[in-house]
Amino acid sequence: MTRRILSGILLILSCLSSLPAAETNFMSSAGMSTNSFNVRDFGAKGDGQTKDTAAIQKALDACVTNGGGTVIVPAGCYLIGSVVMGSNTTLQLAHAANLLGSPDLVDYPLVRGRWEGEFAEIHRALISAEKAGHISILGGGSIFGPSLNLSRLRNPRGPVLIELTECTNVMLEGFSTQYQQLWSIHPLFCQNFTARNLIIRTINTNGDGIDVDSCRDVLIDHCSIDTGDDAISLKSGRGLEAMRLGRPTENVVIRDCTLISSLFGGLGIGTEMSGGIRNVRIENCFISGHQNGIFIKSRDGRGGFIENIIGENLIINNSPTFLALDLVKKGIQASDPVTGQVEQWARVKNISFNHIQVYNVMELVAGKNVPADRPIDGFTLTGITGNCEKGITLANIVNVKLAGINVTGLEGPLLTTNKVQGTGLNNPSAPAK
């Protein structure tokens, strides 16, 4: 409640200070066109009370019609419903520009989209794009999500803040977001997606920061994400529907970020992963999760794969668990689950974490929930320091490598295993060879 009140006060102060006199002209950094389109020239008021949806949409449309360029949002508070960006467009938010989501659900039209891993009818995002290329949202402004009735946000799903579908060459940089109720940023089926120097804040369950969904070539760089759910979640759909599409999330780099979750995890991989997740590197990040720092997860009936996950130079602080592996998790099931004694389980291999510092962590690794019918193949943990109460628990994993694990404060054994094969199992503290 305190966070919500403070957020409201900050928003009011921000709107009071963002008067037209403080307007700043920006040039496009997209390098595609020097055209510029000021939303005030299209009738936007920026007074925080008048709905500026139509005016801003006209500016965005004019940008596309004229071959691309920059849509300038000067200082002010712009109350808007859903708007759609097109190709070759930069949306430039002035430092004191605030986009405020309309509290009226009717301002977010119903469309088809993916929600919790399956296609369904959803409300269109506050800012969306589909099958667009070379789009950017830049600048030091802020985007505030709408305040809506939570009971009406699931069927159909309510609007997320930014949702980009089948887009290429996307840049999100420099702005901040705040939303109480749903995901903030959801790239779906995108290629060459970059999020840099963003400040993302959410509060409630389902308040994920960035949900990377069946995307490839992704960079999340120098972002500060503090959420009520997963700070970053990597997904690729669930069930046979996603397996048939065969569109994994792959080639993802997360670096130099602060990831904080007040309810779940700093980084979640799965459980919606039937299309596969591979080639993920997270490095030089500070992570604090209410349940887990990093959570690799799946369920029966998901199939798919998770492979080539690397974490290096991470600080995990105030988390019950540094790393949790739960591939038999219970919960929401796909409407068309993958069947077969072995095939129903995710294929997981090549998980590696090196040079990790843990502080005030209750359990180092919780890795016993792995199906015996499909063991993890390849798990490396080296160079772990800090303090924790409970050590490492592993089950049904082959090709394990443990070395240089030196933590203090243990109240039991450093390592407990069941059906585990590899090196360093007898002395995990020994230096790596």
PLM-predicted stretches and their roles:
Residues M1-R4:
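Positively charged n-region of N-terminal signal peptides that target proteins for export
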